[in-house]
């Protein structure tokens, strides 16, 4: 789903809004399908872009933002996040935990839930 990122590089706010609306509709289809088969989803991103289209002076920003990105767990099974924030290296151990698979000691990230 690169559309919000790619459109964010253009600096066009209107195009970014449309891209996010399309992305939202696509994600809804995936979520509905996964939940229908009792699956789980971890939804996140590696960086922002369309979330910060202008700087404080009103100039167009076309670079990736350094804002924190959400990590959303979607499932019929409740889980508890054990940290308020994390890093990209934490996503793989968290996925393995959800899949009930062992987390290799070589992984440097932490599981973000219990």
Question: Predicted regions: what is each one?
Answer:
Residues 1-114:
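Feature captures the catalytic ectodomains and active-site-proximal regions of enzymes
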